[in-house]
């Protein structure tokens, strides 16, 4: 079975909302994964597939405007109830992007582009919505050799290598400023769970996720002391001026 057989990202709603609920238990994870992106988050920021906005909470105080985009209106309502100043747009990213602003200083995509068969076309849309000098800030699953039933269940078309992100950036007009692995320990856990046919976050019980949240500073330290292939790649791509 391949991800081509799965319902696409925009319509796998029940699984998506359930995963968002699980991720609410990991505030330290969001702080950690967004930390490398914070220097590039300024001005007007558009976050794609923002969900309930847990990641936005890590940078909202340092930018002038946030536009949260998601296909699920209920998740956006939850986001706006906590952050009334955030503008929300209910948009299917697989369709047209006419409603999205075209003057973003940064666009954030955390675990998004792997859900689109034509990731090049997707990133070209991102390019068109950024100001010259603006940044596409991306997190994607790393290591194609780890591709498994979990990826299929999660609606992933692929996992990424550094070279693939470099090629994708070049083919869409971006300059790759930063590409690096994150979460070395997470990659080891993924290998043990890879035969399970469900979203990765749903393979953990709530108590386990709370424990992981407590351990995030240790995981971050391990990444710094023993860098290596991780569960994810963080990328900072710049639209040339």
Q: Where would I find each of the regions flagged by the language model?
A:
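Short, glycine-/aromatic-enriched active-site segment of Class I SAM-dependent methyltransferases
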Residues: 20, 136-158, 162-168
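Conserved S-adenosyl-L-methionine
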Residues: 174-184
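Core SAM-dependent methyltransferase catalytic element
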Residues: 191-198, 228-241
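A short glycine-rich, Lys/Arg-flanked "PGG" loop and its adjoining helix->strand segment in the class I
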Residues: 120-135
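C-terminal helical/coil "lid" or tail adjacent to the Rossmann-like core of SAM-dependent
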Residues: 186-215
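A short His-aromatic
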Residues: 111, 115
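Conserved N-terminal segment of class I S-adenosyl-L-methionine
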Residues: 1-110, 120-123, 202, 210, ...
């Amino acid at each position: 079975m391949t991800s081509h057989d799965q319902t696409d990202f925009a319509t796998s709603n029940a699984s998506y909302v359930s995963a968002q609920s699980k991720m609410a238990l990991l505030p330290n994870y969001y702080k950690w994964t967004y930390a490398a992106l914070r220097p590039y988050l300024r001005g007007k920021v558009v976050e794609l597939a923002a969900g309930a906005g847990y990641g936005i909470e890590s940078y909202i105080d340092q930018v002038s405007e946030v536009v949260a985009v998601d296909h699920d209106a209920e998740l956006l309502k939850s986001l706006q109830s906590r952050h009334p100043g955030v503008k929300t747009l209910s948009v299917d990213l697989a369709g047209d992007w006419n409603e999205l602003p075209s003057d973003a200083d940064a666009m954030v995509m955390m675990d998004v582009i792997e859900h689109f068969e034509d990731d090049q076309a997707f990133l070209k849309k991102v390019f068109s919505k950024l100001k010259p000098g603006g940044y596409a800030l991306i997190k994607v699953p790393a290591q194609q050799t780890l591709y498994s039933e979990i990826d299929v269940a999660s609606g992933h078309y692929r996992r990424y290598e550094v070279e693939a992100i470099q090629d994708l950036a070049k083919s869409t007009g971006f300059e790759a400023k930063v590409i690096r692995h994150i979460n070395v320990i997470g990659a080891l856990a993924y290998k043990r769970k890879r035969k399970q046919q469900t979203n990765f976050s749903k393979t953990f019980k709530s108590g386990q996720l709370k424990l992981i949240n407590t351990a995030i500073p240790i995981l971050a330290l391990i990444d710094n002391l023993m860098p290596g292939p991780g569960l994810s790649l963080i990328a900072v791509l710049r639209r040339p001026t």
